Amino acid sequence: ASDVTLNSFAEDVTVGECCDCVDLTTVY
């Protein structure tokens, strides 16, 4: 995820690729 907040969140829950889906939804 390009977003710092989502990136940190992904690291906490250890989502990984799922973060990209959320990131795209947030950015676009």
Curated annotation (Swiss-Prot):
Belongs to the venom metalloproteinase (M12B) family. One of its GO terms (biological process) is proteolysis. Binds 1 zinc ion per subunit. GO terms for cellular component: extracellular region. Its main location: secreted. It is found in: Secreted. Its cofactor is Zn(2+). Keywords: Hydrolase, Metal-binding, Metalloprotease, Protease, Secreted, Toxin, Zinc. Its EC number is 3.4.24.-. Expressed by the venom gland. The keyword Zinc applies. This is 50 kDa venom protease. GO terms for molecular function: metal ion binding; metallopeptidase activity; toxin activity. The keyword Mitochondrion does not apply.
